[in-house]
Amino acid sequence: MGKILVLSAVTDDCYTKNSAYILKKYLADVQAGLDKYAGLIGADKRAYLLPEGSDTYGIEGDIYYGISNLTGDNPYSVAQNMEGKLPRPMIQDDFIATYKGDEVCVLTPEAARWIAVGSEVKAITVNVKGNSEVKEAKIGTPLSEVVDASGAKAVLVGGLKGEYVKPESLASMTVGTDFNSSSLTVIGADECIVDTLAKHMDQAWVNSCGKCVLCREGTLQYKTMVEDIIAGKAKMTDIDLIKDVGGLIKLGAYCPYGQNMPRPLLSAIELFSGEIEDHIKRKKCPANICYKKAAPYVILPDLCTGCTDCVDECDEDAILSKKGFIHIIDQDMCEQCGACVDACDEDAIVQVEGKMPRLPKKLVRVGKF
């Protein structure tokens, strides 16, 4: 059986642009490293796997185009990608991935360059306020010297497999050769951490290959739970569930992506428990970003008969009431489950978008408001 050495440039996530940067700036070094490694392992064939729609960067050789994914350095995933299939990894010590009868071996652009020139410098994508820039830093450099995050709320270190940290923590963290140094994304003080997590978990779900149940279902559940926090439908018990599920995923997920997928969400919960609790308990978003899609439930005073039927259906005790008095929904307590709507025969409970109707601020007798 022959060997084919594939340079896989499809490993970057949505926070990272390192592969394209390295191919564009250091193609000669990359090819030198590829040639050297091919000789070391006895690979008689070489190929390049680039993202769909990518530039060729002046590469001469066998070029394949595939789906960018977080398992793009796994030989089996690469072989599947080259065949035009959904790339999914195979994690098994004695398994040999093949493409057209040849054993598949994989290098990333950065790994190939390191073989040629040494691994003293790391490419890092820095994302600030929607702008991305790839910087280079020596291994061991404090992350605080790579990006100025002073005054920021948080920094996502390592993208979809990374973790959220406070800006002051960057001084004690250094540039390494692993994925934790692939990108630094600054979360501004005016941004909402829950809204940020919702976007993050949506990407985590999109990037799950779906091969193992824990990652496939875990990313979907996480995505749904964070969206529920934004919509005002979550409960504090959901946070405990997120933590419990995270432990299971880390232990049982199939590949390194799945095992690390819970890290960003769990780290954010640890750092921003107060802000997240404000969203859940008080329906309060400090950045005034969330709840715009979640129209609040109100009780129309001209239709309410003071029957208390809705009160019996509210598990959160969020309805202020007294028999014969116009009821009032406590917006800080309401979980927006909608159970009260079904209980009201008068159709007095509605969701309001835009301008709120005139409502009583305290209990008033029916017909007296």
Please give the residue ranges for each predicted region.
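Iron-sulfur cluster-binding cysteine motifs and their immediate structural context
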Residues: V213-L220, Q259-N260, L266, D309-I326, ...
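Ferredoxin-type iron-sulfur electron-transfer modules in oxidoreductases and energy-metabolism complexes
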Residues: F179-P296, P301, S321-Q331
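Short, glycine-/Ser/Thr-/acidic-enriched flexible segments
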Residues: T11-D12, S54, P142, L160-E163, ...
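Hydrophobic alpha-helical positions that pack around
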Residues: K3-L7, D13-G33, L40-L143, D148-G151
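Short loop-to-beta-strand transition segments
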Residues: A149-L160
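Short glycine/threonine-rich loop-to-helix capping motif typified by GTGT followed
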Residues: S54-I59, V165-M173, V226-E227, A268-L271, ...
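C-terminal accessory/binding modules appended to enzymatic or scaffolding proteins
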Residues: V121-E133, P286-Q331, E335, A339
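Eukaryotic mixed-charge, acidic/polar low-complexity intrinsically disordered regions
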Residues: Y164-V186
